[in-house]
Amino acid sequence: MTSTEGTGGGDGKGISGFSDIERRSILDPHLSVLELLRRPSDTRPHEALKGEVSDIVGNCAGTTGTGNGSISQSWQTIHRNDSCLSVVPERCPSQATAAGILSSSDTSEDEPDAVNSPSAVHQQLHATPPQKHTKSLEDYRSLNVGIPLVLPEDSNNINNNNKNGSTTGSNGEEDDNDTITKSLNSSSNSFIMPKLSLSQKTQKFRILVLGRPGLKFYHSIPKKYQHMFELPRSHDPAEFKQYTGILVVFQELKEMVSLLNRVCQCNPNRPVIPVCQSGQRQQVRNLLESLLKNRLVSLLYPPVVVNNQPDLLGMFRFLQELSKTVSDNSDMDAEEPNNGSKRLKRSLQRKKKKFIETSAERNGRPHKKRHNNEKVNRWVLWGVSLTLGVGVGYCISHLVSSTWISLTTNPLGPVDPESVSKDLFVFDRQELKLGEMDMDSDHPFGHALFLFKQALKQWNLAVKQFLGRHLSCMERIGPANCLEWPTSDEHTNRVLALGYVML
């Protein structure tokens, strides 16, 4: 027995020494990780492995049995932390969602309660009876997976616990469930609805068709222009403010007067377009003239005969152009809010002026018309007239002065033969150089031209003396600014030409 025990003890020592060698290294050089994990565990007693496993799983070591002998000594360096038992490294989606919803204020209050209060993990571990057989590393892995998750308890349970055991809570604190609801509502309403302002509406061009034959006239309008017209919805004059103008269709003048009275009740007044029957245009014009003078109504377009298709098409084109102007102006309301009303007012004034002119022509009143051919720039006419006047005046003054001089000059005498050597001709004791002698003076035409030039010169001198007498007062006012007339013929001609221009 002794030898057997000694042998058994020697074998036990040999086995323990071999296991100590195996525990020094995690991996064997000739074995894979899977084979290392499936290696059979040693048969050490339960008390020997209890100290090693207790550093890993805490209180679970006393109830779950011995661990695998292949776990190395590096696992023993992990210190015990009881607060980590409620923390699972692998989180499920429900736990992640719950952690995202809860606020940071809740975790600080629940941490000490989770450590002190017995959780489901503690109850499960203590309730498990101790087992004598050993478990491998796979058993511990399955044990970790089987640990239930510690999720936040229901609000009803929390309230019951607070009523039974807790005395630190106050009545003024908000419940966790309410806090979660508020945070979800505030996060979901992140979109802010912009404020819409209906104070400035876009101006739309619309013409109201008013009168008993209005429905028939509306259906006779071409489809191209029908979108600009609308039929009345009621007989209230306050409805007229929504329209740009009012088209009045009538059969008798009494209807026209009653319709215009309704239009006058609208403030501000809307411009009208009268559509009369054949033979009523002149009467309608006379009636409208009195209303326009008193500013009771305004005219958008002259009266149109309902059977006259060219006049109707002209009215439709005018309204279409006016609608484009109003629509273009509505895009610029932020910069120029009153620009559309000004343009509409200008167009109404032009149409009103045209209507008055046509009515004056029909009544036989004289009216001045300006054709396109007469729209010539006046400055061009004035420039051409001044140029022609100066040129003609200069020519006349030159001819008159030359003729006057030739007439007043004494005739030439006989030539003195003694002056030939001196390049001079002496005529009646007057010397004349060769360069100054007129070779054409023997001809009658040349002599007449010479006399005409001399006459113009003499006329120039006479006019100069006449102007000098009337301008002598300037010498008395300012002797420094006295008018000194030049003696040469060139200056004389210029002064005479200036006199003609001034005249």
Curated annotation (Swiss-Prot):
One of its GO terms (biological process) is autophagy. Residues 342-354 have a biased composition (Basic residues). Residues 98-138, 151-186, 328-370 are annotated as: Disordered. The chain crosses the membrane at residues 380-396. Residues 116-126 have a biased composition (Polar residues). Disulfide bonds: none annotated. Residues 155-171 have a biased composition (Low complexity). Signal peptide: none annotated. It is a single-pass membrane protein. It comes from the Eukaryota. Residues 355-364 have a biased composition (Basic and acidic residues). GO terms for cellular component: mitochondrial outer membrane; phagophore assembly site membrane; vacuolar membrane. It is found in: Mitochondrion outer membrane; Vacuole membrane; Preautophagosomal structure membrane. Keywords: Autophagy, Membrane, Mitochondrion, Mitochondrion outer membrane, Transmembrane, Transmembrane helix, Vacuole. Belongs to the ATG32 family. Mitophagy-specific receptor that recruits the autophagic machinery to mitochondria and regulates selective degradation of mitochondria. Mitophagy contributes to regulate mitochondrial quantity and quality by eliminating the mitochondria to a basal level to fulfill cellular energy requirements and preventing excess ROS production. Recruits ATG11 to the surface of mitochondria. Also promotes autophagy-dependent peroxisome degradation. This is Autophagy-related protein 32. The lineage of its organism: Eukaryota, Fungi, Dikarya, Ascomycota, Saccharomycotina.
